[in-house]
A protein has these predicted regions:
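Gly/Ser/Thr-rich loops at beta-strand to alpha-helix junctions
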Residues: 8-14, 39-40
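Active-site-proximal alpha-helical scaffold in enzymes
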Residues: 14-24
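C-terminal catalytic/substrate-binding lobe primarily of soluble NAD(P)-dependent oxidoreductases
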Residues: 22-211
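Beta-strand-loop-alpha-helix segment that lines the small-molecule cofactor/substrate pocket
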Residues: 1-5
Length: 211
């Protein structure tokens, strides 16, 4: 038996969506940005995984922690730092903010890009990937992003033991109604090295984590 990590909602839509978007332009790519939105629930197992992230070593804060050795340029490291960006994205017709799984997804996509380059099929010289949440209003982007920052601070502190007991436990999950009414969408903005830009999207019906 093999365990294949990062093959669910985190991080397949980001990884496959980036690969697909780049293939559509079929030329060297400078940058891909994705803006994710979704509706659904969280199981106790997922919440337990999120809370366990508070134990991760400082090395996990490295945007290229999953990359093979010597596959990161100075330009890539400068342009790929985790950041809070609240702005109107006209191509997506959404406001950007922090994405719930962006810390995990960005590392996976950057690793895939590095492996493609090692296989003599690079996405582009100094390729940069960034991920954000997509929100309907500036207020939603600000308050959700602040809520996520607060959540990350809690799971890194002793307070997490107090908060954890009030959330779903392992074995518990979203109801059938929540799973049926769920959905997800990712909007990818791809910029080629020659300046051409293209917008692609990936979407699905049903809870992205459990259907």
């Amino acid at each position: 038996m093999r365990v294949i990590p990062s093959c669910g909602y985190d991080s397949l839509p980001s990884d496959i969506g980036t690969f697909f978007s780049i293939k559509q332009l079929n030329k060297p790519i400078k940058k891909v940005e994705v803006f994710h939105s979704a509706a659904g629930g969280a199981s106790g197992g997922t919440i337990e995984s999120i809370f366990s992230m508070g134990k991760l070593p400082k090395e996990m804060r490295d945007p290229f922690v999953l990359n093979p050795k010597d596959t990161v340029s100075d330009i890539q490291r400068k342009e790929s730092q985790d950041s809070l960006s609240i702005r109107w994205v006209k191509e997506a017709k959404k406001w950007s903010g922090i994405g719930l799984f962006s810390v995990a997804n960005t590392r996976v996509v950057r690793r895939s890009a590095a492996l493609m380059e090692l296989n003599q099929n690079p996405y582009g010289k100094n390729f940069v990937f960034k991920e954000y949440g997509a929100y309907s209003s500036r207020r939603a982007a600000i308050f959700t992003s602040l809520g996520l920052i607060l959540s990350f601070l809690i799971i890194s502190s002793p307070l997490k033991r107090l908060v954890r007991r009030f959330l779903p436990q392992p074995g518990e999950g979203p109801s059938e109604e929540v799973r049926e009414k769920g959905w997800f969408r990712g909007i990818f903005i791809t910029e080629a090295e020659d300046g051409e830009r293209q917008v692609t999207s990936i979407y699905g019906d049903g809870d992205p984590g459990y259907k």
